[in-house]
Amino acid sequence: MKNVGIKKAALQMSRYVLASKQVQRALKLLGLPASRANEVSGIPKPADTSLSFPGYEAFALHGEAWQAAGEQKPIILMFGVHPWKRDVLARYFSDFRVAYVRTNTSWTKVQTSFCQFTPQAFVFWGMTEIRAAKNYAIKSSIPLWRVEDGFLRSVGLGAQHVLPLSLAVDTTGIYFDPSRPSTLETLISEIGVTENATLIERARRCMSMISAFGLSKYNVGQDVPLKRLPPSDRRRVLVVGQVEDDASIVMGCAARYTNNDIVRITQKENPEAEVIYRPHPDVLGGHRKEFSNPRDVANICTILSGDYDLGSLLDSVDHVYTITSLLGFEALIRRKKVTVFGAPFYSGWGLTDDRQPTPRRTRKPSLDELFAAAYILYPRYCVGSLGSSAEIEHAIMSLALEKNGVPRELAEGVSSALPAEAINVDCVSQTLEGLKSIPS
């Protein structure tokens, strides 16, 4: 077993060194500064991730903050985080020493460790929580935070262990639970109180890049336009299928709708339109439970079962119906009409056709303001040599490059070498062309 570990570490180090050299070479040929290109987050720099200290046996300790230089940093406890993403998540919390509660560790064992330290916060992944831990935190006035993947995550799925470029950290609630306030909801409510022309300009620049390069949360699928469908002069209305027992629906929708319910409502409300139904890929692939069979509505809609690029799909329709899917907001970015039956973070602000009341959401922000709150102010980004000091522009550029065939390590290295304010559609396009012209 020891030899296997040594070989794995050696392989990781060789990949890291190769990626770093590739980034340095590309930056030099592109005429970009290369001083920070010795760090690559797509392949994390090899580190001792098996740190252990007396009294901390209940925890997996990850991150450079556990080294001597960070020994005075406060400690946060993280619950429900899979081992494969612990290293990269620690980079998002560089101001803390991150202690991950090991799987199947009893709360009693965790609590006995508190004689060694007082946690700065308890951090839960999504809605995963240990009741005893939550009660202890409330009783002891320890802040409760929740984390989830950000809205511009990666090229590839988390289920495939693709590491995230962004993380939503919520110190109040979580964005997909409308039953209570969240940090995101507060940001949206307050963003228009003080005019910030620079922030709005950034929002517009970022939305233009997202649209130009067809970016979405996961950026999976081939660039397949809808020209393969039968020609039609009718309006096209897209129904976005979701995993029907997903937390965003269970918590975000007061009524209980199936995907087929939404298809039938869409057809009834748009009898003259061509209704296009995209079932969720995880349901089609048998990875998540199917509650409604798409074949039952095949007579009233066109069902997409292919590997369609979501950006191309949204560009090809006029109107989107969904329960709570983020694809609804991605449609708003592309100036499409959106109808929602639940209460996702972007509903209730006057920008969508809402079928569920959201009484706390009384402001009427512009789309630019809503985007700025949700994509610029709310998430944390972690890209290349910048680590958690990266901005949304770095993530957008990295995703655009990788989606167009640039290896992730190179995409992150090049993107993180540029100042955020210099990144726009032309910059990304020119960099992409430059990278394609570099001999391999």
Curated annotation (Swiss-Prot):
Location of the protein in the cell: Cytoplasm
GO biological process per UniProt: polysaccharide biosynthetic process; polysaccharide transport
GO cellular component terms given for this protein: cytoplasm
Chief location category: cytoplasm
Family: To E.coli capsule polysaccharide export protein KpsC.
Role noted for this protein: Involved in the invasion of nitrogen fixation nodules. May be involved in the biosynthesis of lipopolysaccharides as an enzyme or a regulatory protein.
Name of the featured protein: Lipopolysaccharide-processing protein LpsZ
Species, as recorded: Rhizobium meliloti (Ensifer meliloti)
Chain's gene name: lpsZ
